[in-house]
Swiss-Prot record:
<dbReference type="GO" id="GO:0021524">
    <property type="term" value="P:visceral motor neuron differentiation"/>
</dbReference>
<dbReference type="GO" id="GO:0005737">
    <property type="term" value="C:cytoplasm"/>
</dbReference>
<dbReference type="InterPro" id="IPR018186">
    <property type="entry name" value="TF_T-box_CS"/>
</dbReference>
<dbReference type="GO" id="GO:0000785">
    <property type="term" value="C:chromatin"/>
</dbReference>
<dbReference type="GO" id="GO:0010718">
    <property type="term" value="P:positive regulation of epithelial to mesenchymal transition"/>
</dbReference>
<dbReference type="GO" id="GO:0036306">
    <property type="term" value="P:embryonic heart tube elongation"/>
</dbReference>
<dbReference type="GO" id="GO:0000122">
    <property type="term" value="P:negative regulation of transcription by RNA polymerase II"/>
</dbReference>
<dbReference type="GO" id="GO:0060577">
    <property type="term" value="P:pulmonary vein morphogenesis"/>
</dbReference>
<dbReference type="GO" id="GO:0060392">
    <property type="term" value="P:negative regulation of SMAD protein signal transduction"/>
</dbReference>
<dbReference type="GO" id="GO:0003148">
    <property type="term" value="P:outflow tract septum morphogenesis"/>
</dbReference>
<dbReference type="GO" id="GO:0001708">
    <property type="term" value="P:cell fate specification"/>
</dbReference>
<dbReference type="GO" id="GO:0055008">
    <property type="term" value="P:cardiac muscle tissue morphogenesis"/>
</dbReference>
<dbReference type="GO" id="GO:0035922">
    <property type="term" value="P:foramen ovale closure"/>
</dbReference>
<dbReference type="GO" id="GO:0060045">
    <property type="term" value="P:positive regulation of cardiac muscle cell proliferation"/>
</dbReference>
<dbReference type="InterPro" id="IPR008967">
    <property type="entry name" value="p53-like_TF_DNA-bd_sf"/>
</dbReference>
<dbReference type="GO" id="GO:0036302">
    <property type="term" value="P:atrioventricular canal development"/>
</dbReference>
<dbReference type="GO" id="GO:0001569">
    <property type="term" value="P:branching involved in blood vessel morphogenesis"/>
</dbReference>
Length: 440
């Protein structure tokens, strides 16, 4: 006799919705839809609009505003799409160019990354622009803001060395405009000078009270430069309504905000090209061609003493570099002699006796007894470099061969070895762990 299993009980529509098969099918379909919506190419967001409306701070500038630059960098989903606005005839003549474009291009090819911190971090490369076509008699306000490129969050895939979409963007942070501290400029100043935004700082602190630009980590951003024609009746720089303005965007300045560098090539390029990363630079890993290229970029991108530098400052830059090379530490003479070299060569002064512990410096007795002759100027010990100017009697006595005499006033605050007296200082230098720093 055959066994026939009992018929399976039919589930109601409500119970069927919670079955394993129903849950699995609905979950897979939702995941598929989420994945498709997440990995949409950025070009779809670019095609949705032909222009971008400034953020809330620039909402009053609609009647006279205009955006210049690549449409792909301008048009993003988080920004409000509007119709392109024709600028006034006077503002249409103004053009803006990005300085050190070659350096920006190098970073853009790799995917520029900018560090953001709680306290704020400066940008490198720096946004530096120059204007032409402005009215010499008019006054202009130059400002900068940074807007999101899209509404996506990214992650860096190390195995592919590329950025991938990780999901939707975090909630937008409060938008901020950075008004250049030297604004307003006259048109004549803008034609002669370069405007640098080197003091702009990026932060991820939503409660920042220092005026830094607030960004989200792992999001892509586009810096924008705005120039506004200031009218005489404008009471404040922040009263931008009814003002004529124009916006310039450079696609090569797009960057990803990060809390730590993701791409090692970006780290290397920043170390090699940033003049303030000198301590991390190892010139031996660069070829002659690379070193020459990097040095030329650094020279063009060297920081000026003020946020604005004239075009004729290249000659001054060369003078500054020569002056920097001529400056030495407290341990070198004008002839670039080290302290140990000066000690070994100072026996040319009659009456000078070496302590017995000098042999521990690695200088043989024979070399101490027969020093290499030096000219009189080079033989003078670097007391003036140590804060002890030579008196006329000291110089005269040293030239007459009777041994220099030095003033007996208190030595200024320099290295602690010299505060202990000459003999104790030489003994302190015997230890290899001694740190040679110019100041304490």
């Amino acid at each position: 006799m055959e066994y026939t299993p009992p018929p399976k009980p039919q589930l109601s529509s409500r119970a069927n919705a919670f079955s394993i098969a129903a849950l699995m099918s609905s979950g897979s379909s939702k995941d598929k839809e989420a994945a498709e919506s997440t990995i949409k190419p950025l070009e779809q967001f670019v095609e949705k609009s032909s222009c971008a409306q400034p953020l809330s701070d620039l909402s009053g500038l609609e009647p006279h505003g205009d955006f210049s630059g690549s449409p792909s960098a301008l048009c993003t989903e988080p920004l409000i799409p509007t119709t392109p606005i024709i600028p006034s005839e006077e503002m249409a003549k103004i053009s803006c160019s990005l300085e050190t474009k070659e350096l920006w291009d190098k970073f853009h090819e790799l995917g520029t990354e900018m560090i953001i911190t709680k306290s704020g971090r400066r940008m490198f490369p720096t946004i530096r622009v120059s204007f032409s076509g402005v009215d010499p008699e008019a006054k202009y306000i130059v400002l900068m803001d940074i807007v999101p490129v899209d509404n996506k969050r990214y992650r860096y895939a190390y195995h592919r060395s590329s950025w991938l979409v990780a999901g939707k963007a975090d909630p937008p942070l409060p938008a901020r405009l950075y008004v250049h501290p030297d604004s307003p400029f006259t048109g004549e100043q803008l034609m002669k000078q370069m405007v640098s935004f080197e003091k702009v700082k990026l932060t991820n602190n939503e409660l920042d009270q220092h005026g830094h630009i607030i960004l989200n980590s792992m999001h892509k951003y586009q810096p924008r430069v705005h120039i506004i024609k200031k009218k005489d009746h404008t009471a404040s720089l922040l009263n931008l309504k009814s003002e004529e303005f124009r916006t310039f965007i450079f696609p090569e300045t797009v960057f990803t905000a990060v809390t730590a560098y993701q791409n090692q090539l970006i780290t290397k390029l920043k170390i090699d090209s940033n003049p303030f990363a000198k301590g991390f630079r190892d010139s031996s890993r660069l070829t002659d061609i690379e070193r020459e290229s990097v040095e030329s970029l650094i020279q063009k991108h060297s920081y000026a003493r003020s946020p604005i530098r004239t075009y004729g400052g290249e000659d001054d830059l060369g003078d500054d570099s020569q002056a920097t090379q001529s400056r030495g530490s407290a341990f070198t003479t004008s002839d670039n002699l080290s302290l140990s070299s000066w000690v070994s060569s100072s026996t040319s002064f009659p009456g000078f006796q070496h302590p017995q512990s000098l042999s521990a410096l690695g200088t043989s007795t024979a070399s101490i007894a027969t020093p290499i002759p030096h000219p009189i100027q080079g033989s003078l010990p670097p007391y003036s470099r140590l804060g002890m100017p030579l008196t006329p009697s000291a110089i005269a006595s040293s030239m007459q061969g009777t041994g220099p005499t030095f003033p007996s006033f208190h030595m200024p605050r320099y290295h602690h070895y010299f505060q202990q007296g000459p003999y104790a200082a030489i003994q302190g230098l015997r230890h290899s762990s001694a740190v040679m720093t110019p100041f304490v």
